Structures are given as structure tokens and as C-alpha cells.
A protein has these predicted regions:
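A short, conserved alpha-helix in the catalytic core of glycosyltransferases
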Residues: 192-209, 216-242
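Short beta-strand-to-loop acidic/aromatic patch adjacent to the donor-nucleotide binding site
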Residues: 82-94
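A conserved acidic beta->alpha catalytic loop
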Residues: 29, 35-47, 93-95
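Active-site-adjacent helix/loop segment of glycosyltransferases
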Residues: 236-309
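Glycine-rich, basic loop-to-helix element that forms the pyrophosphate-binding segment
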Residues: 63-81
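Conserved donor NDP-sugar-binding/catalytic core segment of glycosyltransferases
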Residues: 98-166
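Short, well-formed alpha-helical segments that are part of the catalytic scaffolds
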Residues: 12-26
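A recurrent flexible, glycine/aromatic-enriched loop bordering the glycosyltransferase active site
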Residues: 159-171, 181-200, 231, 253
């Protein structure tokens, strides 16, 4: 099965090199690697020129194609016509040697799969427990494994605002648990949302779908938007044996005020992708959880070391929420597969 790897990057030459070196060590190597660089300098271009990687093509995009979703759409337009699977990786990830072997084999195991995601293994400490285990209020339990729950979910459980869906599925009021809440069992799980930076899709779906132009620049939640639309047409899976590490490089991220606004406004947009006409109870829950999460972040002004960062992001969230009363998010160009 032929597959292409698209890596969209911005001002991160060293993390990108680390990723490419891990790709070089793969037991199954990509038929094509496309580097889509939105950098405003030539450091990444120079790094690529100094290092040789088989099947690699480099593109430095102009301003009009800069930004995660634009770069992804640009990359898709450059994929070889013979390719069957298109893979995406964040530029600050590092793969285990059998990542692609396990990821691509999922399409053979599930021939009707439209998309398959990999598994980030370095962000959460999981512990295997007995099958009859009863989790504590500050724990999350799933499929024989437990992990510590964050303060936001602990409070949500106490207030009756926890999600009623499995990890990787979005409830009618959104604010679900991501695929990051799937344990490292080595199993393959069906989901309806994939993390864009560790995802793959059959190339044929791009004849119908594209990444939304609403998500410009950093593109927060663009992966949720895209995968939710695709999941309405077919099955998506996460293979927890396709492992990689994510190191969250600082370069190329928006300021925290803009990020806070994105959390709320982009979150609202994705919620309406899943549920374009929510019932009153779902509207109330979405707003209640959004306000609760803002208050939790605001409390970090007192509890966290970086008080300025907590305040700046909280202000962005507050302004983002109020802005929904004035102007709700709307895609500049309605993407195919979207009903809103």
C-alpha cells in the first residue's frame, strides 16, 4: 500500500530534523515525503539541503499558502497520483521504528477505514489495573487502565458536566475526551475524531474533503473539524501500537490572548460541525463548561508560576465567549462535507 507523508512546518528546523531522522529509521518507509514550509526565513530550507532523505520533496510556500490548513491543502495538491494513503505528522514529533508499519497495516485490518490515527505515548502516565477496578474521583479508567484526571474533568464530574461518550467521540454538547484518553493497550479503537498531527487518510477522500479555510494560522481544532466531517462518511480508527512522542516545540505558536480566543471560538465552530442544531440542554452545557474552563484557567493567576500567561489566555477566552454574541464563527468558503 503506497503512502505519502506530509509535514507542515513553520520556523522549526531542529525539531523537523529530529522527526525526519526517525522517519529514516522506519521499518516501512514512505513512498513520498512532502515538506510544506511556511517559514519566513531560510533556516529550514538550508537544513533540508544539508541532509539527504529518500523520496523527499521540499516546498517553501508563499504568504497566501501559509498557515496549517492552507499548507495541508497545498501539500495534498502535490501528492503523487499513485499514492493510496496520505499521512500527516506534526513537525515536533519523533516516531518509534514501527510507526508506519502499524499505522498502514490498520487499513488492511479494516478495509473500510477512511482514516487512522497514531498514538502519542510520552504525554500521560497510565497504570494497568484489575478488571473490576473502581476509579477514584480524581482518576479516569478505561479498558483495564487508569490515569490521573485533570482538575477540569474532576470538577466537571462533580457538577454533572462530564462527557457521556467514549474517548475520541464528541457528545451533543461537545467538550468530550480526546483520543489522548485511550490507554496504551496496543489495540485499535474506533473513533470519530483524530489528532491531525498524528493522522492518516485514504487519498480518495480528498476528492471530496478539504481542510476548512476558517482555521487560519495556528489552526486550533482544525483536526477535529476535518475528522468529524469525514466520520460522517465512514469509519475512523486509532491504532495504539503506532507510537510516537510529541515534544510541543515552542516556536510557531500564537500569543496566549489569541490562543484563548481560539479555544472558545474554534471550539464553538467545531461543536456546530457535530451538532448544527443543538437542543437547549446541550447549549446550556456547552456554555456552562466553557465558562467553567475559563474560571479554572483564571484561577491559575493565583496558583501558577506564570501568572501573566494565565491571565492573558483567560482574557482571550472571556473576550472570545462574549464575541459569540456579536459575531459567530463562519467559514469564508464552505468546505465540502460541512453541514452547518
Amino acid at each position: 500500500m503506497t503512502f505519502s507523508l506530509i509535514i507542515c512546518t513553520y520556523m522549526r528546523p531542529q525539531p523537523l530534523l529530529d522527526l525526519l531522522q526517525s522517519v529514516q529509521n522506519q521499518s516501512l518507509y514512505p513512498n513520498e515525503i512532502l515538506i510544506i514550509d511556511g517559514s519566513t526565513n531560510v533556516e529550514t530550507k538550508e537544513m533540508i539541503a544539508k541532509n539527504h532523505f529518500e523520496n523527499l520533496n521540499y516546498f517553501l510556500v508563499a504568504k497566501e499558502n501559509r498557515g496549517l490548513t492552507k499548507q495541508r491543502n497545498f501539500g495534498i495538491s502535490k501528492v503523487n497520483s499513485a499514492i493510496e494513503i496520505v499521512c500527516f505528522l506534526d513537525d515536533d514529533t519523533v516516531l518509534e521504528t514501527d510507526y508506519f508499519q502499524n499505522l498502514i497495516s490498520t487499513y488492511t485490518t479494516f478495509p473500510k477505514a477512511l482514516g487512522v490515527g497514531g498514538y502519542i505515548s510520552n504525554e500521560t502516565n497510565w497504570e494497568k489495573v484489575q478488571g473490576n477496578y473502581t476509579p477514584k474521583s480524581n482518576e479516569f479508567y478505561f479498558d483495564g487502565w487508569k490515569r490521573k484526571d485533570g482538575s477540569r474533568f474532576i470538577l466537571r464530574k462533580k457538577m454533572g458536566l462530564d462527557t457521556n461518550r467514549l474517548p475520541g467521540f464528541s457528545p451533543a454538547f461537545s467538550h468530550g475526551r480526546s483520543v489522548g484518553f485511550l490507554p496504551p493497550t496496543g489495540k485499535i479503537y474506533e473513533v470519530e475524531q483524530l489528532m491531525g498531527g498524528v493522522s492518516s487518510f485514504r487519498k480518495i477522500i480528498f476528492d471530496t474533503f478539504s481542510f476548512s479555510t476558517y482555521f487560519e494560522g495556528y489552526g486550533l481544532y482544525e483536526d477535529a473539524d476535518f475528522s468529524l466531517r469525514v466520520s460522517k462518511m465512514g469509519k475512523l480508527y486509532v491504532n495504539t501500537s503506532a507510537k510516537l512522542s510529541h515534544f510541543h516545540a515552542e516556536g510557531g505558536r500564537p500569543n496566549l490572548y489569541k490562543y484563548g480566543k481560539m479555544v472558545v471560538r474554534n471550539g464553538w465552530y467545531v461543536w456546530r460541525i457535530k451538532n448544527p442544531k443543538p437542543m437547549l440542554k446541550d447549549r446550556l452545557k456547552w456554555n456552562a463548561i466553557t465558562i467553567l474552563l475559563t474560571l479554572i484557567r483564571l484561577s491559575n493567576v493565583v496558583t501558577a508560576k506564570n501568572k501573566k500567561a494565565a491571565f492573558t489566555e483567560s482574557l482571550g477566552r472571556i473576550i472570545g465567549w462574549w464575541s459569540l454574541l456579536i459575531k459567530r464563527p463562519k467559514d469564508k468558503k464552505k468546505p465540502v462535507g460541512l453541514s452547518i
